[in-house]
């Protein structure tokens, strides 16, 4: 269904009898399919966590009371507050779009819910000694590309999916850049490559050729030799490498946090880290501010040099 159709059809029934499930299926889902690569995740989240409670409610009938009850129900089911917030974000986004399409007059109900308490953002960083031992162990893995991928993630701060789905045509060695056509934020972004990153990519090319994997513009940077497709993830092999070097409670995504922490601790500004990580909002990067607590003191101490 086209969005134009959505706007035209809305006036016929929306204000009174459009239930959330129909809105999601007939209107919202086709809309996000047109631009959002992760629409399947939203579809799963909706039907798993939102539809059972709200699906049969009319859009205009959803009240803050319902949202509070739903939050309590999610909590009773054992979901962490951080997870509930993620579910709530989708519901809010759906209602915000409904307002923009004039399907409902406002989205106050989903914004007047009780405050959800959440602890500190989970931050797990590896120190240089751990990084060196982990990379060394990953290169010993039976997984043909684990070592290259892990090292590249630490060197670039890329999201795992950005490396996993990268193609050779996205890499410009002369410009020292890997282009992500559509990032998590829905925008094109550039990942800058250091000389070491370029060497790792060259090693990936050599490894691929030795395995008989095509290295053409349209081929994936890291391709499963058995399926000819990109790997779904690297978590199993990564977890084995972690266990072998005695590192606990670390995810692949924590390599991105490690990259950010190394930058901050070496004097890179939050603004620069934001750009390198591809964060759409400085609020996302602000979580790393505590990593360089002496920066303000250093600035004050340096002031006399300017006088």
Residue ranges and their predicted role:
Residues 170-177, 248-249, 268-287, 294, ...:
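Short, polar N-cap/turn motifs at the start of nucleic acid-interacting alpha helices
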Residues 133-137, 189-195, 199, 203, ...:
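DNA/chromatin major-groove-contacting recognition/catalytic segments
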Residues 85, 100-160, 164-165, 174, ...:
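Basic, Lys/Arg- and aromatic-enriched nucleic-acid-binding interface segment
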Residues 1-61, 65, 212-215:
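N-terminal DNA-binding module of tyrosine recombinases/phage integrases
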Residues 45, 49, 57-69, 76-113, ...:
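N-terminal DNA-binding recognition helix of tyrosine site-specific recombinases/integrases
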Residues 100, 151, 155-162, 237-242, ...:
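C-terminal catalytic core of tyrosine-transesterase DNA break-rejoin enzymes
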Residues 131-132, 194-248:
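Active-site/catalytic core of tyrosine-dependent DNA strand-transfer enzymes
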Residues 62, 146-147, 248-266:
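Short basic/aromatic active-site micro-motif
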């Amino acid at each position: 269904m086209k969005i134009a159709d959505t706007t035209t059809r809305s006036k016929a029934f929306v204000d009174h009898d459009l239930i959330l499930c129909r809105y999601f299926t007939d209107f919202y889902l086709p809309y996000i399919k047109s631009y959002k690569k992760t629409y399947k995740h939203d579809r799963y989240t909706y039907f798993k966590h939102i539809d059972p409670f709200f699906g049969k409610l009319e859009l205009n009938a959803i009240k803050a009371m319902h949202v509070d009850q739903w939050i309590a129900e999610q909590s009773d089911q054992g979901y962490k507050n951080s997870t509930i917030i993620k579910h709530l974000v989708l519901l809010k986004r759906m209602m915000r779009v409904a307002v923009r399409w004039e399907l409902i007059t406002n989205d106050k109900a989903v914004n007047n819910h009780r405050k959800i308490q959440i602890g500190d953002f989970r931050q797990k960083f590896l120190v240089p000694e751990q990084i060196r031992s982990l990379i060394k162990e990953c290169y010993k893995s039976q997984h043909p590309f684990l070592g290259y991928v892990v090292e590249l993630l630490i060197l670039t701060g890329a999201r795992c999916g950005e490396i996993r789905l990268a193609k050779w045509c996205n890499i410009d060695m002369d410009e020292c850049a890997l282009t992500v056509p559509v990032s998590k934020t829905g925008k094109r972004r550039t990942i800058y490559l250091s000389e070491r990153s370029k060497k790792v990519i060259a090693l990936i090319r050599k490894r691929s050729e030795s395995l008989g994997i095509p290295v053409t513009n349209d081929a994936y940077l890291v391709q499963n030799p058995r399926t000819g497709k990109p790997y779904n993830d690297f978590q199993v092999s990564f977890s084995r490498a972690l266990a072998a070097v005695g590192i606990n409670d670390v995810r692949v995504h924590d390599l991105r946090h490690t990259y950010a922490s190394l930058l901050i601790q070496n004097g890179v500004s939050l603004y620069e880290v934001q750009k390198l990580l591809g964060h759409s909002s400085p609020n996302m990067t602000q979580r790393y501010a505590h990593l360089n607590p002496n920066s303000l003191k250093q600035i004050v101490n340096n002031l006399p040099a300017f006088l």
